[in-house]
C-alpha cells in the first residue's frame, strides 16, 4: 500500500469537499470556509440535502452528507444540527425510517424507493448509525430503531433485503441490545459468512467504517481480513475503486484512508 500515492490522487482528482475530508482525517485540519459555504449552499431550508436526488431533500442523501460532516469533525453547528433534525423529524413511530414520498417521481435506484421494506430496513440502519455518531440515536416518543430492525431479520440474524443493511446496523446493535448480545453476534457472523475479498474498495471501506464504529477491534478476524483485502485492492494510481464508478474514486480513496487511519494502519 502506498499512502503517498493515495494522498496525491485525492489532492489531484478530488473536489474541495473530498480534499477537506482528507485533511480533517489525516491531519485534523479544520474545513476551509469555502467548503462550509458550499455545504450550506446545498442544504435545503428544511435542513435536508439532495445529492443523488438534487431536486428534493431526502433521507438517504441527508445521512450521506452527515457522514461527510463526521469526516470533517463537524458534530454541532448550522449544518449538522438541522440535518440531524431533518432525520429525527422523519423517524416513524415504529422506530424505522422510509424515504420521502417525493422520490417516487424521480428516476432513481430501487434502493431509494419508498414503501419497500428493503428500503426501510437499510435506511433505518443507516440513519441510526449516522445519528449515533452525532449523539442522537432516536427521536423522543418513538421506539428504538433496534425494535424495527430486529422485527425484520431472519433466524440467522440477517436483516431483510440488502446485505449491507446488516453491517450498517452493527453500530445500533452494539449500542442496544449491546456488543455481547445475540443479535449483534449473529449480525457479525452473517457478514463474515457473506464476505467477499473481491468487493470494490469503497464497499470494503464502508464495511470497515461500520465495524470500527461498532467497536470491533483491529485484531477481530473479520476486521483483519477486510483491512488486508482493502490494502491489497489499492490501484496503481493510488486510488481505490468505487462501486459507483470512476467518478467517485477520489471519495472512495478518502473513505479507505479514513478506516486505515482509524485502525492504525497509517
Give the residues covered by each predicted segment.
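Preference for long, amphipathic alpha-helical scaffolds in soluble/luminal domains
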Residues: 1-266
Amino acid at each position: 500500500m502506498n499512502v503517498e500515492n493515495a494522498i496525491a490522487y485525492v489532492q489531484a482528482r478530488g473536489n474541495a469537499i473530498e480534499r477537506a475530508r482528507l485533511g480533517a482525517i489525516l491531519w485534523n485540519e479544520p474545513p476551509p470556509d469555502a467548503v462550509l459555504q458550499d455545504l450550506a449552499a446545498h442544504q435545503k431550508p428544511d435542513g435536508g440535502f439532495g445529492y443523488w436526488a438534487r431536486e428534493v431533500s431526502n433521507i438517504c442523501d441527508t445521512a450521506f452528507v452527515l457522514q461527510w460532516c463526521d469526516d470533517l469533525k463537524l458534530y454541532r453547528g448550522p449544518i449538522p444540527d438541522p440535518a440531524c433534525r431533518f432525520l429525527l423529524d422523519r423517524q416513524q413511530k415504529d422506530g424505522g425510517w422510509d424515504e420521502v414520498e417525493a422520490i417516487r417521481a424521480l428516476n432513481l435506484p430501487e434502493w431509494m424507493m419508498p414503501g419497500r421494506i428493503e428500503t426501510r430496513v437499510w435506511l433505518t440502519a443507516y440513519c441510526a448509525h449516522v445519528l449515533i455518531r452525532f449523539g442522537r440515536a432516536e427521536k423522543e416518543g418513538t421506539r428504538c430503531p433496534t425494535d424495527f430492525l430486529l422485527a425484520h431479520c431472519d433466524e440467522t440474524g440477517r436483516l431483510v433485503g440488502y446485505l449491507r443493511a446488516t453491517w450498517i446496523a452493527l453500530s445500533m446493535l452494539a449500542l442496544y441490545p449491546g456488543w455481547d448480545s445475540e443479535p449483534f453476534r449473529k449480525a457479525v457472523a452473517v457478514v463474515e459468512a457473506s464476505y467477499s475479498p473481491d468487493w470494490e474498495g469503497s464497499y470494503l471501506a464502508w464495511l470497515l467504517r461500520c465495524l470500527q464504529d461498532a467497536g470491533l477491534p483491529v485484531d477481530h478476524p473479520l476486521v483483519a481480513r477486510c483491512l488486508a483485502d482493502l490494502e491489497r485492492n489499492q490501484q496503481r494510481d493510488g486510488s481505490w475503486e468505487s462501486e459507483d464508478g470512476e467518478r467517485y474514486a477520489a471519495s472512495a480513496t478518502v473513505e479507505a484512508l479514513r478506516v486505515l487511519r482509524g485502525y492504525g494502519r497509517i
